[in-house]
C-alpha cells in the first residue's frame, strides 16, 4: 500500500528548521485517533518523539466508557499506540489542578447564571499552559496536538486559522492561545479531512483507527451537567421563581438555575401560556429564571472580558462566533482588545441565544483574531 501524502511529507507538517533527526517533538496524546495519528506523523519525520498524556480527573467510575477524553481506557490506548510506534510515553497526574481550574469553575459559572465552556478553560490551562511547560522541560522543539486548526505564518508571525475541514474545525475552543504558545505549538491535522486521519491510522496499524470521537466535556460521563454541578456545589439545586421578564408575573417555580440557560425553551414546566416562552436571563442573586417571547432574545451587542488577541488587529471586516456551532456573523469591535482588556462587539443583525459565560471568538476570514468571555449583553430593541 503506498503511503498517504501526509505520511510521505510528514516533516513539512511540523515546520522545524534543520534535520529532523536532530529534533525532539512532544505530542499531547489523549488516546484518541487524532492525537495518535499526530504521534505517528511525528515518528515518520525521523525526529525523537515523546508522547505525554495528562490524567485530568478521577476516571475510576468511567473506566470502560466510550466517548470521554483521557479516561482510564484512553490512557491505556495512548500507551498502546506509543508502544506500536516505538516512542516514549509518560502520564502525568494533573487531577488536582484540573478540578480547581476547570471543574470547580464550571460549577461556579452555572451557579452564577452563566453557561460555561470548560473545554476553553482546559485549553487555556492544563492542555496548553501545563503541557507546554512539560514539553520545554523535556527539551522539545515543539508541542504537537491533534486539534483541527492551522498554524499559518503571517507577516507578523504565526497565526491561528480555521481547519481546512469546516466540519472538524476547533478554532473556537483555541482563541485563548497566546502568541508565545502559538510559536511553540504545531497542529499537523489542520489541513486534513477526518477521513484521511483515519486512513493514516489504519496504514500505521493503530488499534484506535476506528475509535469513536471523544466528547468535548470529558468529566460529564452521561451528559448530566446538573449532577456534576451538584457534586461540587450542592447548593445548586436551590429552587426559585420563574418570572416573565416583561410583566414581572411569577409563572412558576424552578428546580435550580443550574438547570437553565439563555435561549432554552423546553423543560420550563409553565404550560398554558399564550405564546412560546424562552429563558431570557438568569438572576442568580435572587435565584430567578427570567422568561419571555423569542423577540426578547434578540441581542444588539455583547461585552466581552478577559480578551486575548493573537497578532495585530487586521484592517479587514470582522466576524464573530458566539457559540461553538454557530455561524460567524458580521460584527464591529469597540474598545481595547487583547491582554485581558474588556471590549464590546456590535452585531449587524439581531443575534439570538447569546449567553453570558460563552465565548465570543473573532475572525478575519479564516484567521482567528482572538476572543473573550461574554459578560453581558444589550438587547436589540425591535420597533413596533
UniProtKB/Swiss-Prot annotation:
It is found in: Cytoplasm. The keyword Isomerase does not apply. Residues 168-170 are annotated as: Interaction with tRNA. InterPro entries: MnmA-like (IPR004506), MnmA-like_C (IPR046885), MnmA-like_central (IPR046884), MnmA-like_central_sf (IPR023382), Rossmann-like_a/b/a_fold (IPR014729). It catalyses: S-sulfanyl-L-cysteinyl-[protein] + uridine(34) in tRNA + AH2 + ATP = 2-thiouridine(34) in tRNA + L-cysteinyl-[protein] + A + AMP + diphosphate + H(+). Its EC number is 2.8.1.13. GO terms for biological process: tRNA wobble position uridine thiolation. The record marks 147, 358 as: Interaction with tRNA. GO terms for cellular component: cytoplasm. The keyword Transcription does not apply. GO terms for molecular function: ATP binding; tRNA binding; tRNA-uridine 2-sulfurtransferase activity. Belongs to the MnmA/TRMU family. This is tRNA-specific 2-thiouridylase MnmA.
Amino acid at each position: 500500500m503506498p503511503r498517504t501524502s501526509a505520511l510521505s511529507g510528514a516533516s513539512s507538517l511540523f515546520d522545524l528548521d534543520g534535520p529532523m533527526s536532530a529534533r525532539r517533538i512532544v505530542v499531547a496524546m489523549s488516546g484518541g485517533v487524532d492525537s495518535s495519528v499526530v504521534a505517528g506523523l511525528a515518528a515518520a519525520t525521523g525526529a525523537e518523539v515523546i508522547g505525554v498524556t495528562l490524567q485530568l480527573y478521577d476516571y475510576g467510575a468511567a473506566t470502560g466508557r466510550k466517548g470521554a477524553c483521557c479516561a482510564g481506557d484512553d490512557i491505556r490506548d495512548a500507551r498502546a499506540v506509543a508502544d506500536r510506534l516505538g516512542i516514549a510515553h509518560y502520564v502525568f497526574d494533573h487531577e488536582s489542578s484540573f478540578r480547581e481550574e476547570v471543574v470547580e469553575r464550571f460549577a461556579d459559572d452555572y451557579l452564577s447564571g452563566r453557561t460555561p465552556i470548560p473545554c476553553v478553560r482546559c485549553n487555556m490551562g492544563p492542555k496548553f499552559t501545563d503541557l507546554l511547560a512539560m514539553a520545554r522541560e523535556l527539551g522539545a522543539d515543539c508541542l504537537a496536538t491533534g486539534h483541527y486548526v492551522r498554524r499559518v505564518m503571517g507577516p507578523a508571525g504565526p497565526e491561528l486559522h480555521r481547519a481546512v475541514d469546516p466540519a472538524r474545525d476547533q478554532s473556537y475552543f483555541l482563541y485563548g492561545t497566546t502568541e508565545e504558545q502559538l510559536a511553540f505549538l504545531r497542529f499537523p491535522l489542520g489541513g486534513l479531512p477526518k477521513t484521511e486521519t483515519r486512513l493514516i491510522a489504519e496504514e500505521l496499524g493503530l488499534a484506535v483507527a476506528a475509535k469513536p470521537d471523544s466528547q468535548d466535556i470529558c468529566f460529564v460521563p452521561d451528559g448530566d451537567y446538573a449532577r456534576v454541578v451538584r457534586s461540587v456545589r450542592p447548593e445548586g439545586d436551590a429552587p426559585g421563581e420563574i418570572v416573565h421578564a416583561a410583566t414581572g408575573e411569577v409563572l412558576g417555580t424552578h428546580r435550580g438555575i443550574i438547570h437553565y440557560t439563555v435561549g432554552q425553551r423546553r423543560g420550563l414546566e409553565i404550560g398554558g401560556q399564550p405564546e412560546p416562552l424562552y429563558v431570557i436571563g438568569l438572576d442568580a442573586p435572587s435565584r430567578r429564571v427570567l422568561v419571555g417571547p423569542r423577540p426578547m432574545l434578540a441581542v444588539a451587542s455583547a461585552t466581552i472580558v478577559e480578551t486575548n488577541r493573537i497578532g495585530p488587529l487586521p484592517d479587514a471586516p470582522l466576524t464573530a462566533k458566539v457559540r461553538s456551532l454557530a455561524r460567524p456573523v458580521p460584527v464591529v469591535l469597540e474598545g481595547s482588545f487583547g491582554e485581558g482588556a474588556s471590549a464590546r462587539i456590535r452585531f449587524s443583525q439581531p443575534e439570538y441565544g447569546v449567553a453570558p459565560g460563552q465565548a465570543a471568538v473573532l475572525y478575519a476570514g479564516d484567521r482567528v483574531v482572538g476572543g473573550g468571555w461574554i459578560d453581558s449583553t444589550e438587547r436589540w430593541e425591535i420597533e413596533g
